[in-house]
């Protein structure tokens, strides 16, 4: 089984040089990339705390900002005239997508994109974060139910003599058609202006697998969710990358359910990508280093079950997002710095190197390793008997030292199969061509 595996010499991997050398598209034809999407520049400017992520294999924007040449995220107030309702129920820009001007939005969006991405050859991640409403009627529950209520009211006003079932059907159709027009139109404009960017919406697809209290929690998407996601084929077809969220709710802390939760969320992204006819559509889950809405940092095990799980499924990488709230005080900045230095950094070096070595050993360097269905617990984590991670004397970047043993290479081939990069094929991605 190991006869095809490439011999790998002793590896001394200086991650600083790797990060500085990656000026090509951020994630294309690389096994696994970590993107630091955080305004941790404030830690240095306001508190004198230098969160130095450049020493790891983490693609960052200059100044560690949310927007730059490697990635740009557009929040709702930063791109066009996104319609929504405030928490008080007041409409902004019409409130509903079917009650707002798409032309005005696209004209404003045109200017916003050029201002945020001045370079026409931008080839980084381009993420749109619209969270007020969801494009499928059935998914607008709880606080988002206002979009269904106001959609019904709009139809009722237009047709006061219609019975309730007619109103419901028309309201649903009008809302979903308008939502599609707004989202697809915004993506299309972005791709026209910056065609090399990896355009997509944060949080899509979702799996809605939040039933953590169930004694037999499987992590699977609830019944009907995949069918609803299949109705968003227009979104997957228009996207150039998928950005599902794998933020870990605090309810998962201390349970054994994290891997199941993440596994099925990432799997749903790959499922819709395949259904859209683009198996090479990059999947880049959004992760946090904290439990969502808390200041509690993830343990090493939770990193394995989120970042490691994403890598095991063949994700192109992960986006590590840190809330502005987590950088407000000197204490929180120091906590982030210590975590990066002692826990996150070494783990990122481990998993990115593991994915790289697996790609070279199993997939001829021309594809990503994807965990075989028969090995549900396998992760691209390096064998501590074969590798060590050590700081460089004098405070330089971490260095990975070691070599894959024959046993390591055989185990990789047993646990992982290949998803070839475009232009390569074969069991081990050893042949050029698409057939």
UniProtKB/Swiss-Prot annotation:
Family: Belongs to the glycosyl hydrolase 56 family.
EC annotation from Swiss-Prot or TrEMBL: 3.2.1.35
Catalytic activity: Random hydrolysis of (1->4)-linkages between N-acetyl-beta-D-glucosamine and D-glucuronate residues in hyaluronate
GO biological process: carbohydrate metabolic process; cartilage development; cellular response to interleukin-1; cellular response to pH; cellular response to platelet-derived growth factor stimulus; cellular response to UV-B; hyaluronan catabolic process; hyaluronan metabolic process
Residues in the signal sequence: 1-21
Disulfide bond sites: 43-333, 207-221, 358-369, 363-418, 420-429
Protein's name in the database: Hyaluronidase-1
Molecular function in Gene Ontology: hyalurononglucosaminidase activity
Location within or outside the cell: Secreted; Lysosome
Domain of life of the organism encoding this protein: Eukaryota
Tissue-wise expression: Highly expressed in spleen, kidney, and lung.
Role of this protein: May have a role in promoting tumor progression. May block the TGFB1-enhanced cell growth.
Glycosylation sites: 70, 99, 107, 121, 216, 256, 350
Gene name in the database record: HYAL1
Main location: secreted
Pfam families: Glyco_hydro_56 (PF01630)
Record-level GO cellular component terms: cytoplasmic vesicle; extracellular space; hyaluranon cable; lysosome
InterPro entries assigned to the protein according to its UniProt record, in alphabetical order: Aldolase_TIM, Glycoside_hydrolase_SF, Hyaluronidase
């Amino acid at each position: 089984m190991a006869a095809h595996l490439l011999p790998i010499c002793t590896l001394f991997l200086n991650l600083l040089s790797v990060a500085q050398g990656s000026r090509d598209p951020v994630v294309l034809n690389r096994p696994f990339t970590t993107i630091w999407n955080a305004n941790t520049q404030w830690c240095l400017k306001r508190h004198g705390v230098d969160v130095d992520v450049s020493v790891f294999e983490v693609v960052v924007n200059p100044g560690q900002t949310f927007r730059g040449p490697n990635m740009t995220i557009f929040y709702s107030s930063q791109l066009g005239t996104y319609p929504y309702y405030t928490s008080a129920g007041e409409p902004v820009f019409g409130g509903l997508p079917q009650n707002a001007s798409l032309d005005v939005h696209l004209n404003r969006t045109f200017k916003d994109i050029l201002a945020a991405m001045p370079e026409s050859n931008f080839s980084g991640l381009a993420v749109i974060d619209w969270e007020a409403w969801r494009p499928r009627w059935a998914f607008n529950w709880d606080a988002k139910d206002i979009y269904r209520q106001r959609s019904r009211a709009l139809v009722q006003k237009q047709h006061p003599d219609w019975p309730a079932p007619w109103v419901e059907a028309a309201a649903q159709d009008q809302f979903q058609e308008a939502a599609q027009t707004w989202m697809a139109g915004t993506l299309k404009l972005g791709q026209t202006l910056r065609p090399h960017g990896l355009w997509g919406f944060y949080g899509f697809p979702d799996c809605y697998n939040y039933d953590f209290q169930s004694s037999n929690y499987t992590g699977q998407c609830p019944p009907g969710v995949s069918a609803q996601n299949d109705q968003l084929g227009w979104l997957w077809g228009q996207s150039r990358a998928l950005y599902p969220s794998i933020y870990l709710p605090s309810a998962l802390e201390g349970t054994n359910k994290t891997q199941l939760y993440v596994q099925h969320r990432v799997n749903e992204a790959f499922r819709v990508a395949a259904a859209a006819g683009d198996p090479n559509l990059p999947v880049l889950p959004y992760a946090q280093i904290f439990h969502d809405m808390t200041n509690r940092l993830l343990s090493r095990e939770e990193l394995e079950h989120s970042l490691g799980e994403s890598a095991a499924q063949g994700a192109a990488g992960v986006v590590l997002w840190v809330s502005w709230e987590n950088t407000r005080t000197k204490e929180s900045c120091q906590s982030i710095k210590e975590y990066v230095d002692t826990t996150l950094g070494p783990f990122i070096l481990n998993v990115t190197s593991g994915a790289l070595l697996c790609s070279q050993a199993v997939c001829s360097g021309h594809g990503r390793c994807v965990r075989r269905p028969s090995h549900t617990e396998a992760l691209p984590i390096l064998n501590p008997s074969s590798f060590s991670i050590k700081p460089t004397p004098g405070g330089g970047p971490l260095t990975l030292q070691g070599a894959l043993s024959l046993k390591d290479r055989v185990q990789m081939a047993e646990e992982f199969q290949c998803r070839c990069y475009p232009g390569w094929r074969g069991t081990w991605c050893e042949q050029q061509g698409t057939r």
